[in-house]
Amino acid sequence: MGNLIQTIPGENYSRVDDRAFTHNGCIIDLGCVRWNWSEIFIGKKRVIGADPFENEVPDGTELFKGVVGSFDGLIKMTYQEDGSHISNGSDSGDWIPSISWKSFCSRFNITDISILKMNIEGAEFPLLHSMDSEDFSKIDQIIVSFHDWMNPSWKHLTDASMYLLNQHGFTVHNIGPYGWYMGRK
């Protein structure tokens, strides 16, 4: 096991195991708006981000301008500076491409992942539960913000997701406020 480092200096929720720099896999940043979480890896590792509202593609990165979720298709989303969300029937919003985890990995030819980071405003639950043992076997570390702190009725989803990660060989630890957890194999 390596040492814990912060990808954003001074932010405990950004802690990762520094073995990511020597692990053969890529960095996946779901919810990569402003690229601040993954910036430390740009130019050192292959970095692939996904975010429907990110417009910048820094040199050394790849971007899926949409949502990585549990299905291929379209979803309606409302943009908010501090956390966009899937629109309900009465909300205005934009139709955004959604791609399943398997389709995302196929599109970007992803076979080995050093870190999968997810800050996707509640969509982490269906995404994680759409993944199978083959998907989890590709991942060395998972960093996720479970959003039950915003919606306490999602606590059971967080518990089920933590159980799922444990079942797939991850030791999960709380790393900061706002529901941030790190899972390492």
What is each stretch, according to the model?
Residues M1-K185:
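Phosphate/nucleotide-binding beta-alpha loop and adjacent structural elements of enzyme active sites
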